[in-house]
């Protein structure tokens, strides 16, 4: 397994729409494993393949305290959503920035697991929010897209400054 490079805004590759996975095979499973390694290394709770410049419909999530409840979503589809909620969300592609984003309180999805088996999942709370956030990535949408243009601009400037400082270090 290896840690992949996470793309940061304003990288346009984050705006690409991911294509469905045709077949869950050893290559896809390796991508899933590398994505988990990357997510844990970056101390995230979710990661979409788009964020590591792989434009396929793959998501990995682990919202557990002990970091031992891996969830793999390949070709996820949103079946139902209900209620309203929101928390201050962060994103590995938008480092050190957070903003309140409106989300559905509960979701029901259909996806394939790491072995290609179909399943359905009903989620609420942090897991539901994380699923929606990561599914947005698969269609090229970022949490800042829910914000006003002024807030988007401020966040972009802060991330670009942070990336410049990190490049010098």
From Swiss-Prot:
Known catalytic reactions: N-terminal N-formyl-L-methionyl-[peptide] + H2O = N-terminal L-methionyl-[peptide] + formate
EC number(s) from the headed UniProt entry: 3.5.1.88
GO molecular function, one term: peptide deformylase activity
Annotated catalytic residues: 134
InterPro entries in alphabetical order: Peptide_deformylase (IPR023635), Peptide_deformylase_sf (IPR036821)
Enzyme class: hydrolase
Cofactor binding remark: Binds 1 Fe(2+) ion.
Pfam family, one: Pep_deformylase
Cofactor: Fe(2+)
Keyword Metal-binding: yes
One GO term (biological process): co-translational protein modification
Keyword vocabulary terms for this entry: Hydrolase, Iron, Metal-binding, Protein biosynthesis
Positions with a binding annotation for Fe cation: 91, 133, 137
Job description of the protein: Removes the formyl group from the N-terminal Met of newly synthesized proteins. Requires at least a dipeptide for an efficient rate of reaction. N-terminal L-methionine is a prerequisite for activity but the enzyme has broad specificity at other positions.
NCBIfam families cross-referenced by the UniProt entry: pept_deformyl, PRK00150.1-3
Name of the protein this chain belongs to: Peptide deformylase
Source organism: Salmonella typhimurium (strain LT2 / SGSC1412 / ATCC 700720)
């Amino acid at each position: 397994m290896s840690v992949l490079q996470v793309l940061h805004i304003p990288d346009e590759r984050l705006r690409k729409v991911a294509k469905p996975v045709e077949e869950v095979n050893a290559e896809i499973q390796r991508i899933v494993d590398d994505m988990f390694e990357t997510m844990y290394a970056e101390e995230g709770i979710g990661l979409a393949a788009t964020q590591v410049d792989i434009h396929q419909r793959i998501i990995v999530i682990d919202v557990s305290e002990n970091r031992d409840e891996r969830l793999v979503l390949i070709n996820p589809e949103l079946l139902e959503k209900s209620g309203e909620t929101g928390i201050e969300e962060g994103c590995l592609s938008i480092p050190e920035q957070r903003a309140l984003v409106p989300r559905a309180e509960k979701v029901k999805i259909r996806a394939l697991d790491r072995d290609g088996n179909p399943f359905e999942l009903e989620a609420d709370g942090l897991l539901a929010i994380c699923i929606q956030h990561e599914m947005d990535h698969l269609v090229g949408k970022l949490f800042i897209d829910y914000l006003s243009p002024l807030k988007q601009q401020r966040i972009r400037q802060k991330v670009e400054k942070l990336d410049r400082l990190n490049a010098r270090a």
